[in-house]
A protein has these predicted regions:
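Nucleic-acid endonuclease domains
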Residues: 1-74, 80-511
Length: 511
């Protein structure tokens, strides 16, 4: 595969071009007048990438499944992606600049790589696949999405180019990417073998992205394969998960991470390998009480969350929380210890994701394109299960094993979409209200901090499986830092209803 002469560069030329662009806004480097298109269209997907490719590098855009450029004879894919300081870290970056500021930057979204190949012959060799050819060597340019609201395409002109990096994957990461790709390839091969007729084959492929999703570690398939109103079929692209891109971004800006990173001594290249590891741990530790586990794993008796610490030690590592393990973070695996009764009940509500209200302000946003949709698609849960036989005697609590689940299409389309749409309607119709809590006499109740108790009328756990709840140690006027429709409130989070989790876990066998 060769590129045209206008796409051939030396590393020195690339350095000169990108160093000259760093610190400038996308609008300032737009020599090819990409932003002129925004006069006619408010939404232009990929306009930041168009500016980098056509203005900074100076080559024309194409849609070929080939690498963008050649650097000193080495084929390289150019990717432009947005980074941003999460709202939770805004207090930490106040007054900071340069490297001290940049270490707080995280990925705004995943990185789209290339179209999934559907036309036969289906590619079967990973090393020569379009996906790996475009992923093996990446030149990633970072711009800062300096907004917490959705901006029109023209607004990107104000976003600064922060930095860039050359990215190649470790052997461990390549193994994970290869396993993900082979899962997709094998599925397509089987469908093409079983269904020779194109229409029947397409009907069989509808929804296959959701079917494969629980088994993919680092890759996401978006959008879903489905029939459109015109009768054609919407086909997906390979995309690196936002969780994985976030790992890349933070590793680039925080050079000290490698020293402090918490990794498993024995990682896994597939969910099948992780499941096998969990099964082996279950065989070894199932039925052991917390005191027995503490002694077997060498854990100090003063440790507070003993069950979580036991699981951390089972995996051969040592940290404060399971979700500090980078192997889990890359793949969007949320590790959460669950304590049940012998009947399987009493599971607490689970706190999930902080809500950025930028998408709620965009009336034209589609659910399938939303950050909320991506979150529920990309994340799965690994649940170490403990059974509490006596609520008054923790020493009788025993380890039962592991269960793992992802959100299926039905749950996302029904429960998550319902919460997303209903909360957006409250905002767009100006129906969002503050609801005070009253005592039996009809007086407003006050909390221990002296503030009146209450919350906005967002979806509640009484009626929704996915609901809103504020997050702060105390609720005061000072901690109500979020403002929606002029109503001040605590930062809002998505929560998952405990009864749903309990029912889901009862339906799933132990690994």
């Amino acid at each position: 595969m060769a590129v045209s002469e206008d796409r051939k560069f030396t590393k020195e030329q690339v350095y000169t071009l990108l160093e000259g662009a760093k610190g400038k806004t996308l609008g300032e480097v737009d020599k090819s007048h990409q932003f002129a298109r925004t006069l006619e269209s408010k939404k232009i997907t990929g306009i930041a990438g168009d500016v980098i490719e056509q203005s900074v590098f100076g080559y024309k855009k194409d849609s070929k499944q080939e690498c963008d450029i050649e650097i000193d004879g080495v084929l390289t894919e150019v990717k432009t992606t947005g980074v941003r300081v999460p709202k939770r870290d805004l207090k930490n970056v106040s007054g900071k600049k340069g490297e001290a500021y940049n270490i707080y930057l995280g990925a705004k979204e995943g990185i789209s790589i290339t179209h999934v190949t559907f036309e036969p012959p289906i590619q079967t060799d990973f090393d020569t696949s379009h996906f790996w050819e475009k992923t093996e060597r990446l030149l990633i340019i970072f711009y800062e999405y300096k907004s917490y609201e959705v901006v029109p395409a023209s607004g990107y002109a104000k976003f600064p180019i922060v930095d860039y990096c050359y990215n190649s994957f470790s052997q461990e990461e390549k193994d994970k990417l290869q396993n993900d790709w082979e899962i997709v390839s094998s599925h397509l091969q089987q469908v093409y073998h079983d269904y020779q007729d194109a229409e029947k084959r397409n009907e069989q492929l509808v929804g296959f992205t959701h079917l494969l999703r629980p088994n993919l570690l680092l890759i996401e398939l978006v959008p879903g394969f489905k029939r459109t109103a015109t009768g054609s079929y919407q086909k997906p692209r390979y995309r690196l998960k936002q969780t994985f891109v976030d790992y890349i971004v933070r590793g680039h800006f925080d050079k000290s991470r490698a020293k402090n990173e918490i990794v498993l001594k024995e990682s896994f290249s597939s969910f099948a390998q992780l499941d096998a590891r969990c099964h082996a741990l279950t065989l070894k530790y199932k039925g052991k009480t917390l005191p027995e586990l503490r002694e077997m794993l060498g854990i100090d008796a003063k440790v507070k969350d003993i069950s979580a610490k036991c699981v951390i030690r089972m995996f051969g590592t040592d940290c404060n929380r399971l979700n500090q393990i980078s192997d889990f973070n890359k793949a969007g695996i949320i590790a959460k210890t669950i304590t049940i009764t012998p009947q399987g009940g009493r599971t607490e509500d689970m706190k999930l994701k902080h809500i950025d209200f930028e998408e709620w302000a965009d009336r034209d946003a589609d659910f399938e394109d939303s950050d909320v949709y991506d979150y529920f698609c990309e994340h799965s849960f690994l649940c170490p299960i403990f059974c509490e036989h006596d609520s008054k005697d923790p020493s009788k609590t025993v380890f039962e094993g592991f269960k793992r689940f992802a959100f299926d299409e039905e749950f996302i389309e029904n429960e998550v979409r319902r919460t997303w749409e209903d909360s957006r309607n409250l905002i767009h119709r100006n129906e969002l209200e503050w609801e005070y809590v009253y005592d039996k006499k009809g007086n407003k109740r006050m909390n221990n901090s002296g503030s009146y108790m209450g919350a906005p009328n967002f979806p509640k756990s009484s009626e929704y499986k996915v609901f809103f709840r504020g997050g702060a140690d105390v609720s005061t006027e000072k901690t109500r830092t979020e403002s929606v429709n002029g109503i001040r409130m605590l930062p809002q989070f998505f929560w998952l209803k405990g009864s749903y989790i309990a029912k889901k876990l009862q339906e799933i066998p132990y690994i």
